[in-house]
Amino acid sequence: MLLRFRSKIGMNRVSCEATDLFGDVVENWVKEVGLNVDPGTVVVGNDPGSAKEPVSNIAGRSVEEMGLKHGDIVYIEYSDSSGSNEGQSVPVNAVGAGSAVISELPVDVLLEKEDGLIKRTRSSLCKHGDKGMCEYCSPLPPWDKEYHAENKLKHISFHSYLKKLNEATNKKSSGSSYIPPLSQPDYKINKRCNNGHEPWPRGICSKCQPSAITLQQQEFRMVDHVEIQQSDLINQFIESWRATGMQRFGYLYGSYEKYDSTPLGVKAVVHAIYEPPQHDEQDGLTMDLEQVEEEMQKVDQIAMSMGLLRVGLIFSDLTDTGNGNGTVFCKRHKDSFFLSSLEIIMAAKHQLAFPNASRFSEQGKFSSKFVTCVVSGNLDSEIDITSYQVSIEAEALVDAKMISGSTHPSMAYINETNEEVYVPEIFYMKTNEYGLTVKENAKPAFPVDYLLVSLTHGFITEDSKNQIKFHSTGGFPWANRQAMGLSQDYQELKNYLYSAATGGDYNLLHEKISNFHLLLYIKSLEIFNEKDWSLLITSAISENWEQPLIQLTTTESFNSLVLIMEMI
């Protein structure tokens, strides 16, 4: 149905459903006409001059409950907002709430302050003194193509890309207002188009339908490197496959930090792996998504108290060669695939679920820093890790439900247009047999390589500034490993911790409690109050752990834990 809104700027039509909340309809009207509205002043009425009902009072009622029908006129009055909200639409539902503050990651705040210039020394072409500078030795911008080609860097970093766009979009010589250089692509058809026609699938126009899409390999990457704090972390993860022959899936917990090996680079530092409930098989696995999501929300909250974020996912794809020497088949290479179409879609859904906050984007978010790691066989038949992200175009295609998996893992199938989804023309650029770049129609399927962004990976180095957060990765069973005959219970807790908790060796006790899975289990017992829990976390992961640990052993919570172990 269409509602007509009469205001001081004229008549405007807004498409809606009878079940839509009236507050949402008014908010869509604000967005469509691009108004600068003070939400506290918006009032509506049925007749000219009768607009006295504040929208905030009726925002929670549906259009049907308001008695509005197709074609009805709503008279609306408002005052223009001013100040810091200029040029931005404000949600009318959130009366009294200030404009949203975008909370960026600390690493983004840090890198935004740096220029990232690539310094160069004097060369033989320089004709000046030590204090001079010329075109042969002046610093290069962080996105310089020749520098990246010489150093074999396939992608520029996100912040290099951002500075490149910002320099082109907001030139210093221009006196115009600031324009956000980033915009999250949206390939979905606009079902609220107010261009005088019924919504899709009963009507369509050039304004509401998405434009043709041309896929290109992404030149930047949100994360440049994945750093795993301990090699034993991966060994513990693949121990499940070694014991059962079944594949395994887990989430990576860690943080994002500055990466010095590329200009303005970012790395995901992995401190722990958590395996959600799953049914493993030789060629895949099955999960109850609702159960997994419920459990992971709890783990996320506990991990946050340790200063950790869910930074990615990891899964295995291993098949033993049968030679008895620990070798595995190499399944993923340039002549087969690196990530299958189904895995691309899975990665895109996770990236959409973990958006990257950015104040330089029109939407306040841009792509994601969530990474995908695969443990599989390399060309030497050794167990190895590869790390990826999918492009921002992949995120938009999956969000718009335009692609699905195919029987060929290296190809993504393009869905047909239906009542819910409008699929425009999709093309991709390729080099033909004559070495020329040509545009190909992507339907019915196209190579998933156009959606893939490869990352580097490695383990912590001796000179790394990062402190190892958890000193123990094994000893205490990981969660959800009942298929291996392992479970987290009081007996396992006693076997792992009791002697250290009562022996008086604080170094040993620190090493034992510095275990991600032990801490999660202790939290689930609900023995520790908030104060003692904070003390336990400090004792487990802090550099200066001695005094907090001594204090911890005197608390009622810790002594209750020891008492429980004694009773087993």
UniProtKB/Swiss-Prot annotation:
One of its GO terms (molecular function) is ubiquitin binding. Involved in the import of nuclear-targeted proteins into the nucleus and the export of poly(A) RNA out of the nucleus. Has a role in the endoplasmic reticulum-associated degradation (ERAD) pathway. It comes from the Eukaryota. One of its GO terms (cellular component) is nuclear membrane. Its main location: cytoplasm. InterPro entries: MPN, Npl4, NPL4_C, NPL4_Zn-bd_put, Ubiquitin-like_domsf. Residues 226-366 form the MPN domain. It is found in: Cytoplasm, Perinuclear region; Endoplasmic reticulum membrane; Nucleus membrane. It comes from Vanderwaltozyma polyspora (strain ATCC 22028 / DSM 70294 / BCRC 21397 / CBS 2163 / NBRC 10782 / NRRL Y-8283 / UCD 57-17). Belongs to the NPL4 family. The gene is NPL4. Keywords: Cytoplasm, Endoplasmic reticulum, Membrane, mRNA transport, Nucleus, Protein transport, Translocation, Transport. It is a peripheral membrane protein. One of its GO terms (biological process) is protein transport. This is Nuclear protein localization protein 4. CDD domains: MPN_NPL4 (cd08061).
